[in-house]
Amino acid sequence: ARYLADYAPTLAINTLRLRLAALSRWHTDQGFADPTKSPLVRQVLKGIRSLHAVPEKRARPLELAVLQQIDQWLDVAIGNAQRSGDRPALLRQTRNRSLMLLGFWRGFRSDELVNLRVENIEVTPGQGMACYLGRTKGDRQLQGRVFKCPALSRLCPVTAFNAWVSLAGLTEGPVFRKIDRWGHVAEESLHVNSSIPLLRRPF
């Protein structure tokens, strides 16, 4: 409840819901009681929705059922690329999976995803990852912020991130990059407007 109150002035209600979902999944996976189901949390979320009501301008957030469908498609595509030796396709789909899962569980916007850098992400095996962003919406002091994401038993953003940077051999620079038809990974990041279309192509 305190977490919701702290971030209510700077985060949209849909982003808060996504973060609650990630917290809920982590506690369930670890065998802990789910704190997000408490009456206090529901009451605080309802109050935030009323107090910080704004016209909804964002696209509807990806729902968990749709996320699972896309992830299943990507899993098949990655397997097919591995068996056929199609490295360009393997790189693209592995990147897209990491982009999708990290964007979903952290509620990152497209501009935040493309600004992520490998050297600013710290992974703790079996626990989660911490992503530092130098520029974020609502960061009035321009000091940057650290976003934490837990490791999950499935649809795990940490596993997907590790798979992508390992496959692409990335040690620094942008996390999510362009890939040409020959499988060359570019030095520069994806364009801010290109991340969403990448995830719509399977459907």
Task: Give the residues covered by each predicted segment.
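Extended, non-catalytic subsegments within catalytic or DNA/protein-binding/adaptor domains
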Residues: A1-F203
